[in-house]
C-alpha cells in the first residue's frame, strides 16, 4: 500500500498577501488562544475553528443550526363563489388549515375547442371576411381584384396543406384554431387578496407579464412555459452533410506576403498539415482503413467535415389545429407571501378572519383565435411561353363559430406549513408586524404626438423599483389579426415575411433574358413569418417635485442596462425591447432588506414623461407602470391590516 509523500505549503508573503491572508494576525491569535487556554488549565489548549473564524474565513468548514420542526402540505380548495366559466369571477376561501400559508397555484383545464364547418365559396363571389377585409374568389382570366383582366390566370381552392376543395361544396372546410401566447398569464385578468373585507394586494395580467419578462430565470423558462400553456420548440436534425473546410493558410501554397499597418512586408507561415488532418480526418482514410490506423498527414488543401443541420418546430397550443385538445394550466400567484417563505402568513393569527383570493377570468375571445382554413390558389400560365408558370396563394378568411370552451378542475393549491405547538402558541399570543412588498399599478391612456407626461397618481408608499412599458392599443385590438401574439408586448410589432417563392427556374427558351419575370415560381401557402418588436419610447424622464431623477435617458438604458446591472440573479434583461425598469434600490428583489426607495406618498408630484415617434391621435397607446411598494402588515385581534393605506 502506497503512502503519501511529505509536502510543504509555500505561501508568498508579499504586501498584498499580508493584507489578504493576515498570516501574522492568524499566528498571533492561535498563540494567544493557546496561552489563555493553558492559563485556565484546559487539557486541550488548541483553539476551536469557531474561534479562528472570528477573524479568518475557513472555506473547508461547514456549519448548521438546529431548526424548528416544520412540515408542509398542499391543500386543494374549490371556488367559494362564482360560476366557473370564462369571463366570470371566482373567489377561493383560504381554510383554517395548518399554521401558515405560503405558496399558491391555480389549476384549470380549458376544454377542447374547434371552429364550425363552412361552405366553400362560388367562383366570382365576394364576402366580408375577418377583421373587416373583403374576400374575393376571382374568375379565371382576371387578377385578384376580379376586375382587371389577367390572361392565363386560373383559380382553385385548397386547404392550408394544399389539398384541393371543390367550390360551392357545403360544409367543405373549417378554420383552424389556436391559443394566444401565454394563455395562463392572460386568463387571470385580475387577482386580489382580501382579509375581512380589506384588500391587501392585487395585480393584473400586465404585472404577471412583466414579472415573466424580468424575473423568470432562463433555466426555468421551459418549465414556466409548460405551466402557462406556451408551446416550447422541439429540436430536429438533418442527415449527415458533407462540407469543404477552407483554411487561408493552405499548406500546398507558397507562404503569402502580407503588408502590416506600417507598410512593412512580412511572410506568414501556413498551418501545419498534420494538425489539420487530425481535426478533419474524413479525407485521410478510406472506408477500409477508417478507425484502424493513424491519421496520415496530407498535403491536399481540401479538408472535409461532416455535420448536421438543426431545425426547430412547434406543435403546442399556439400552433393552428383543426381541433385543440384540452389545455391544463398551472398559474402561480404573485403575492408577497407566495414569493418568500419567510413572509408566510401565520394562519393561526387570523383564526376568525375571512381570507379570500378573488380571480377575474378573461373571456374566450381573448384566449383563442382562428387561422384561415381555406386558400385561393392562382396558377398563371404566361401566353406564348407555356413553360413558365407562377403559383400564388391568398387566404379566404371568413370567421367561423368557435365551440364554447369549458372550464373544469378549477382548484387553488395552497401550501400550508405546520409547526410544533410551542411555536404555534408564540404566534397566537404575540402581535406580528412585518415589512411586505405589494403591487401598485397604473395604466394611463395616451394619444399625444411626440411627447407626453403623466402624473403617477395611483402609485403610493415607498417605491423600490418600477417596471414600465408603453403598449400600443393596436396590440389588443380585435381588428389586429395578430393580437393574440401581440397582447403582451410593449412595442409596435411588425411582420417580417420570408421571400414568397421557394422554387424558381428559368425556362430553356428564356435562358438568354434571365429576367425575374421570366422565372417559374411557386409561393408558400403560409410563408415563414417572424415578428419584430419595435420600441416606441425614445427617451424617458422621471421627476419628483420638479427635480429630474431621470432626465431624458434613452429607452435602451432602462430596458437593457438597468436590469443587466441591478438585481443579480433575481432580475434578467428582457427579450422585449419596450419593457423598461427604473430602480431606486441598490439590490432590487435580491434580498429582504430594503436598499433604497422613493416615498411617493410624500413626493406626490411624481411624473413620468417620454418622447415617441409612434403615438398619435390614431396610433394610441397605454402606459403601464407596475411598482414594488413597501408597506407593513399588522396582525392582531384576529385580523390583518396594512399599516399605511394612503
From Swiss-Prot:
Pfam families: Capsid_NCLDV. It comes from the Viruses. The keyword Magnesium does not apply. It is a peripheral membrane protein. InterPro entries: MCP_C, MCP_C_sf, VP_dsDNA_II. SUPFAM superfamilies: Group II dsDNA viruses VP. One of its GO terms (cellular component) is host cell cytosol. Keywords: Capsid protein, Host cytoplasm, Host endoplasmic reticulum, Host membrane, Host-virus interaction, Late protein, Membrane, Viral attachment to host cell, Virion, Virus entry into host cell. Coiled coil: none annotated. GO terms for molecular function: structural molecule activity. Its main location: virion. One of its GO terms (biological process) is symbiont entry into host cell. It is found in: Virion; Host endoplasmic reticulum membrane; Host cytoplasm, Host cytosol. Induction: Expressed in the late phase of the viral replicative cycle. Capsid protein that self-assembles to form the pseudo-hexameric capsomers of the icosahedral capsid. The capsid is constructed of 2760 pseudo-hexameric capsomers and 12 pentameric capsomers, with a T=277 symmetry, about 200 nm in diameter. The capsid encapsulates the DNA-containing nucleoid, the core shell and the inner membrane. Plays an essential role in virion assembly. Involved in virus attachment to the host cell. Belongs to the NCLDV major capsid protein family. Homotrimer. The membrane-bound form, but not the cytosolic one, assembles into large complexes. Interacts with the minor capsid proteins M1249L and p17; these interactions form a rigid zipper structure that stabilizes the capsomers. This is Major capsid protein. It comes from African swine fever virus (isolate Pig/Kenya/KEN-50/1950) (ASFV).
